Structures are given as C-alpha cells and as structure tokens.
Amino acid sequence: MTKQLRSIIGILFVGLLMFPAIVKADGGGVSLKGNFQSDALVGQLDSVIGATGYNGPFVSNSYLDLSLASQYVTAGARLELLHCPLPGFEDAFAGGGLPNIYVTGKYKWFEATIGNVYDQFGSGFIFRAYEDRPLGVDNSLRGARFVFTPYKGIRLKALGGMQRKYFNYGMNNAFGFDYSQGAVMGADLELNVSEWSKVMQEGGYNLLFGASYVSKYDPDEVIQPSPLYKLNLPQFVGAGDVRVRFQKGGWNALVEYAYKANDPSADNGYIYKPGQAAMLSLAYSQRGMSFLVQAKRSENMSFRSDRTGSGIGGFINHMPAFSMTHTYALAAMYPYATQYGTPKARGEWAFQAEARYTFKRKTPMGGKYGTSFRLNGTYIRGIKANPLETNITGTLQGTNGYTSPFFGFGDETYYLDVHLEFSKKITKTFSMTALYMFQQYNQAVVEGHGWNAAEEGYWFKGSKTADIANSHIGIVELKYKPSKNIGMRGELQYLFTRQDRGQWVYALYEISLFQQAMIEISDLYNADATKQHYYKVAASYNWGTHRVQLSYGRTRAGYNCSGGVCRYVPASKGLALSYSVSF
C-alpha cells in the first residue's frame, strides 16, 4: 500500500473517531451510530491437517462502520482494513480503504441515495446487492438509487452503478477501489392492492404484485473458441421478474418467475441459451404449529457484472437456497451450494417441506413443560439437459448449448436432507434437543470432485469412486441452568458415512457465567481417514455492546456457506481474537 494511501486512511480514521465529540458539541438533531469489528489470527503451521501457509504471521479482517443521521439526511462510510486477510479470502480481498460511502436524503414520498447502495428485487432472482462478511461477499453498487412512493400501496425503485470487486491496486487505481468494467441498472415496482381496498383490509387480506427489470452493460471483448472465429458477445443483457404474494391470517403464498436473456459467460461455457427461474411457496403458521412447502426450478441463471468472472464474487443476482442452513457442526459438514448453471450442472429442481408442532403443556405428549417436533426435508436434483450438436471445435461455445423440457428431471441427485428434531424441557433447569438426519451430498457437483478410492490416503480402499456421500447423523444437546447466573450446555454428535473421510465425532462443553462470560471446549475427531483431532478452547466476554472472544485450536478445511453461497476455507491452527462494539 502506498504512503499516500496510508496517510489518507489514517486521517479519515482519526476524523471518523472524532465524530462523536463533534455531534455532542453540536447538540442538534444529528445522531451518530456505528460499529467496529475485527477478527484476527496468529497462525501456526500444522502440516498434518494441511495448515501450511497464511497471508502473514498476523492476519486480520477489520471493519469500521459509521453513519450520521438527521431528520432528512443520512451519511455513512465504512473503513476496511484487510491487508493480510484471514484464511479463505483470496488475493482480491487484500487491501484497505473506504470502499463504501453514501449519502441518503428523504423527503415525503421521495428518497435518493448517492454512493454505495444495497438492495434486492423480489427474492433476488435477478438482483440482490448485499454484504455477508463471513462469506466475503460485498457486491454493492457505487452509483445512485431513487425510491418513489407517490401513493399508498405504490413503490417504485430505480438504481444503477458499477459493482464492487473488492481491492485492486495499480498504476491507474492508487486507492484500490475496484469495480466491474461495465455497469448495472434496474427498476422495481410493487403494488400493494390491499392498500386500496377497505374490504380487503377489514378481512385481513394482503395482496402484492411486483415486477422488476435489470440490465447489465459489459463491454465487448475478444473470446475465440478457435482461431477461425470469435464470439459475437451481447454488450447489454436484460432480465425480468414478476411475482405475486398473498397473505391471509397465518397463510402466506408466493409465486415468482424470472427470465434472463442470452448471456454467454465463463460460468455457462459461453452458450447463448436464455435463463429462467420459477418458484412456488406456501406456508401456514399459528401458535404451536406451522408448515412450509416450496418448489423451485432454475436453469442458466448465473448473472455476473463481468462475463469472465469466477468464484462467488461479482454476482448481480442471488438464487435463494432450498436447503436448511444447519448450526450443528456435523449437520453442517456437507453444506449445499446453489447451482446457477454450469456445463456440469445446468440448473436444478429443488423441493423443501417443513412441519413444526408443539404439544401443549400438561398433555400426554407435552408433559409438564411441552414438547416440540420439527420435520424437515430437502430434495435437489438436476434438470434434464439434452446437448445440441457441437461447433467446429467440438465444444458448445457459441451455440444454445442444450434443450430442456420444463418438467424434465436429470439423472443426478445433487442433495437430499431429511431430519427430525425433538426438543423438550424436562425440568425448570434442564432441557434437551435430539436430532437425526439422513443426508446425500453430491461432491462431484457441489465441490467439483468425488473422492477416488484408488488414491492413496483414503480410508475406504477397495470401494468404488464415491461422488455422493451418504451420511447418517445423530445429535444430542443438553442444557442445564442451575441458577440465573450460571448456564451449561453440552453437545455430542456422530456422523457415519462410508464415503469421503468416513466417520466423525464431535463433543462440546460450554459454561456461561453472569450472562456475560462464556468458556467453551470442543473437539472434532475423524475416526477413519485421518484419525486427527480438531480441538478448540474459547472464552468470550460481553460488556454492554462490547464483545471480545479469544480462542486457540485447529480448524478443519471445509466450506463456509450461507443462503446457498459457499466459500472454501483452508485448514488453520493458531490463536484467534475477535472484538466488536456498537454505539
């Protein structure tokens, strides 16, 4: 980083820290809000688990968010310091500066934002700009957004800008703020019909129609499947979305459809077939009971600001996951990543259903304190894709790629998850949760490989190549709270599979003191392939809005996932320190 940039960041950092005093002295109708977060690791080499290198002896991700708000205007900025980022964050993350800054003005039915904006149209099929720090996702647009609410029940949004791509220092980019080479623009209209009907309001009905359009501009470039010809690439690619949501009492129904024009890219192998996505969701909820059923079909819906992009950065859209995000360690060992459309997986059919029921207290099943059950099932399968004839180079580049009947299912299961969870409070101080899960996980599709039994070092020698890992998982969690100031929690988990690395066992013990301090000891053990322990000791303390955590131990290599988006995180070992504060 240049000396000039260090000086500018230092001045801005000091100036931002002085804002509280300035606001307090002003005494006007201006308020300051902010938060600071820093995650650091002093890494140690451990070749046994694959922790063979870090970005430096001390690696950290630090963020400072500040916003000043008055009655009509809000201004904010975020300082990021990621010069030596944590394991799992690629080189594009390395850097520091103020990549996020904005000013928003509101008056009556109009709102305008200049700077970096985050937003989402509908379910995100064609547009979602958001931040997820643990995943390393920040695809905000630097540009402008306008929101109009001219009449009750009507909201119109229009926005445009260049998409963020983290940091990239160079001769022509001294500040390191890197953005897409093209631009993204779009509009979203929502009509809440219930706001116009007194009958619907009195009956408790809510009916909403939505429509969106997004277009990206990506400058032309030379991509040649062979020396004989180059691809004629569209510089403007449009996508549209329509949706209807209906609510009545505990009922909630959603139907949504999106269409994307032909968008040849590195993701889809530079084919010209349009993309589409359709979703149906029905849910019901009342006290003590709820259920949810969902179905989604999507194909060729990778939509990036740069057609040659890769990894999890640069997406304009977000395809919502139909697999549950598990919090237990072994249940989350094989997380599913949504398939946007690649030559290996052109799309997916996804189904999810869930039912919850709580037996009332003082009933045969409920007992003295009540009993809760939750049954959840997810099934995701590929779409049927019939390849077209290849071009003169023997590939599908420059063609429509394939045909696919809408209701056609492919030959491969991508993911299956069925689990039953039981929760019961046994006494005033003691409660338990038990869970059983059966899971099928297609490693060849999700991770790009299957584990080959013929390779040296794998525990199941002699068996066939395993693209799908079949797992049986059992979990028991116990909670004991003998007093107001003391609480204890323990977990015992077991995962059985004959594929991948074989069986795993996980145990955790946690004690909380005075609702402020917590000490945790855990160990993850692989009983077959590696026979390695991944131990960890952690302590945390909360004081007001301050939180600090210190831990030491091993972390296995694996995938960190949220909402169907996954990032590979390599193995690590060392002393980790996290601190956060809000004000």
Give the predicted meaning of each segment:
Residues 43, 121-124, 166-167, 219-222, ...:
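Short acidic/His/Gly/Ser-rich catalytic and metal-binding motifs that mark active-site loops
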Residues 10-20:
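Bacterial N-terminal signal peptides
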Residues 131-134, 171-179, 230-231:
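Flexible, glycine/proline-enriched loop segments at strand-loop-helix junctions
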Residues 128-132, 172-174, 267-270, 277:
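Short helix/strand-bridging catalytic loops that position acidic/His residues to coordinate divalent metals
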Residues 2-9:
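Bacterial N-terminal signal peptides that target proteins for export
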Residues 125-126, 168-172, 221-225, 256:
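A short secondary-structure junction signal
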Residues 37, 59, 197-204, 209-213, ...:
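Exposed, low-structure sequence patches enriched in small/polar residues
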Residues 23-119, 125-127, 140-160, 180-198, ...:
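Beta-barrel outer-membrane channel/assembly domains of diderm bacteria
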